[in-house]
Amino acid sequence: MSIVLMCAVLSVLGLRLTQLQGFSASTYAAQAEAQRLRTIVLPAARGAITDRAGHTLAQYVELRAVYANPTNVRDIAGTAAKLAPVLDDSTEALRRRLTTDPAEHIKFVYLARGLTPDVAEKVSALGLRGIGITEERGRTYPSRELAANVIGFMRHGDGDILEGGGGLELAYDEVLRGTDGLRRLEANPAGIEIPSGQSREKDPIPGSSLRLTLERDIQWNAQNAIADAVRTSEADGGTAVVMDPRTGDILAMADAPQFDPNNITARDTPALGNRSTRDAYEPGSVNKVITMAAALDRGLITSETPMTIPPFITRGGVRIEDSEPHGVEHLTAAGVLARSSNIGTVEISERVGRIGLEQALRSFGLGARTGLNFPGEGAGLLPAARDWSGSQAATISYGQGMSATALQMASVYATIANGGVRVTPRLVDAITGPDGVVKVTPQPPGQRVVSAQTAATLTRMLEAVATNEGTAPLAEVPGYRVAGKTGTAKRPDPVHGGYQGYVPSFIGFAPADDPRVVVEIVLDNPKKGYFGGQVAAPVFQRVMSFALTTLGVPQPITRPAPLLLDLDR
């Protein structure tokens, strides 16, 4: 019996040995290999972002991260002590990160991130068991705050992957990020690569780069100008937009306050968006240009149409006055615009009618996004004419009771400057792929809004604004003809309702005879001065002067005779 039992045992052992040596050898070998092999992600270089001349605004940088496999670290205290001076960290902090619960079998812990390759090499030279180095994505913004509201910033998303968190970094994230590579290598139990071990690699594919329409120096000047204006007027914020009316190219888009995308803190949160595209405000008198355009284009007025302006009018039970008290005045239509008369504008809008005015507002792009495709862009608010109250039908003609973004209003004036043709604003001029092929961003065909004659007449009327006869002599640019309009809008109070404070602005273009540049300045709730001609016009003058000089725009040779504005003189 014992002999039979022994034979049976030997038979089972033999079968098992045969299984180990033959049938399962490949399986166990594969398992052993899998335990030795590690997969490392090779981050793709994120594409650069430059201005129109190729100056770098955002670029990829090679960074390293130091990690630990706590299960392979034998001497936690000693390892922490050796790493501390290299990583510029405390021994105690590193010791805490290395100390994990054995029951949890944690095999990956970051010890330091965002390191330069030099620091990573020093860590590697220590030869510490259980400590490894991995590549990671890095992003740097050489000019710091310059155009940060446009470029955006980066954040750590799902899986701790660095991705666009705002602005163009977000809008073009898939274009910029590229495709990561992979590396499979053989390592010993301590996590250290075996030099003679097997290794397989798939190269990363870099992301594409963006060339913007921004002009670095014009952007820099606009940022400084709006920041200075916000500070001196004690405003809550401000924005400046500079455009080429012929192409829709945005040469500058500046906000105040700004932030540094290299080092974002909690206090930067309110500044992380883009005021020019996000914030809608009641534009006030800069909107009068649309009312005038509608009347001119329909042949209802000319620049010399006589207008009788009483001290006040009442519409829908609301008393409407001009900014300065006056008796009965006799102005031309050009004078109504130059003096920014609310009363005269309402009377002209009533010739156009509600439906006609709404059509004009929408044809200029109000009530809809501009087509820039910028993250968080707003459309403003333009109610349908059928829903306007009696007072709203009047106030909308001079920019109260509706809202628009700064970019929308800049586009309105660009349309006039472009002979009545509206073009879509652009921020990205071209995309360069990893293969070096440059693809210029196509510009949709322009849309005619008003006739070329209407645009020309309106331009002449707007020239009178930036003179001693108008509301903005401080907007004059020596040597150039400037066409533009002031705005001093009441600011809605989101907490208590009604209005509290003001939003002064100035929008204009130059040279008036051959427009090359549109500049818009908007200040939010200034405490020292609030008229557009007082606080916004000087900022316009500073930004416009610099832009014209930077672009080498020639001065006009002749100037036309001034328009008749006041029939009482």
Where are these predicted regions, by residue range?
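Hydrophobic alpha-helical transmembrane signal-anchor segments
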Residues: M1-T27
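Short beta->alpha transition motifs characteristic of CBS
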Residues: Y60-A65, G157, A252-Q258
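Short, small/polar residue-rich loop motifs at catalytic or cofactor-binding pockets
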Residues: R36, V41-A45, D180, E234-G238, ...
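Conserved, well-ordered alpha-helix/loop/beta-strand core segments that scaffold catalytic motifs
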Residues: I194-G238
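Beta-lactam-recognizing serine transpeptidase/beta-lactamase-like catalytic domain environment
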Residues: P189-S199, P245-S285, I290-N525, P562-R569
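Short, gly/Ser/Thr-rich active-site loops of penicillin-recognizing serine hydrolases
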Residues: V438-Q443, A537-R569
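Short extracytoplasmic
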Residues: Q35-L63
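Small/polar-residue-rich segments within soluble enzyme cores
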Residues: F23, G78-P85, R97-G207, I521, ...
